[in-house]
């Protein structure tokens, strides 16, 4: 079957959906499925996978820089200071390369982009597509969460080592963490809470966009950006549910919907990609690490990066690209499991302090910790990806295909 494409054009109000002949046939019941938005079902974008791998490594580098050491006054500063200002150029470069918060923002934008395309593949019926989409999200996220929590619990029971307090390992709290109701066993799971909350939002906005076009994406994006300035809405990542980054998913959806037309109208997409990456990298150094405007600007540049990678000139293949794509494939498990190394790295200030006293720069220790942690976690992440994540994906496809015959039969009865 040839992939079905959804073409885009500009209207007076911006980017809007334009039904192709095949989609008109589908709407008339002659075509039962729907292809990707602008990217065919069989066409894969290696650059997006590679960018996801780079983002996962950025988070790991960020966490390694947070390890502390005893200085001459017995204080425990981080190996790499968290502020860009009044620091050495090397520290600033480390923080830019290890911008873990920005990397998570990029994850959210990329999720919005990819899920927009996923929805375009499913049955073109609101009721018919809800089940497969939500089942897919649950089985994409939760199997690896269960596996990771089991590893953390096993390590705690065997050694007593953990990132949190022993109270976090009570039976009720372990269940709550497994369901992503709490995230005090593995703090990085706060972003997965946001992913699950965003799923119904993305689903609703996709169908609103199909009905009303770009205003149904642009208006929620601006509303959510406005809400992000509210402390009650945004919260603190890791301490309760954080909703402040929900607009990042919507920006990813906008990039998916409007990106192809935008890139077609702009020359030199490769140069624009470089500029977008530079803008992403410099947002926090220029506006401040904790500034909400920094996050908003990062989101915009992340949307542009995703757009230029997906719809612009293909990225050059090579060894670095292959390595980045590999980490992109295992990025989810790598992101979850890398926190295991922090149990050790964040609890050895005396050892790091001795190394600093011996003349080793703290930033060098952070880089050594990063390389070591990547070497340790990569095999485990590879196994979890191969065994757990793929099993969840297979189960999701099986359940989806079980639903489809019934959904199609119901559609025939309604027709």
For the regions a language model picked out, list residue spans one by one.
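Generic alpha-helical transmembrane segments of integral inner-membrane proteins
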Residues: 57, 146, 150-154, 158, ...
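Membrane-interface helix-loop-helix regions
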Residues: 75-99, 126-137, 141-196, 200, ...
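Alpha-helical transmembrane segments in multi-pass integral membrane proteins
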Residues: 6, 21, 29-47, 61-101, ...
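Residues within membrane-spanning alpha-helices of integral membrane proteins
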Residues: 49, 53-56, 111, 146, ...
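Hydrophobic alpha-helical transmembrane segments
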Residues: 103-113, 194-201
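Hydrophobic, membrane-inserted alpha-helices
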Residues: 178, 198-205, 221-229, 274-281
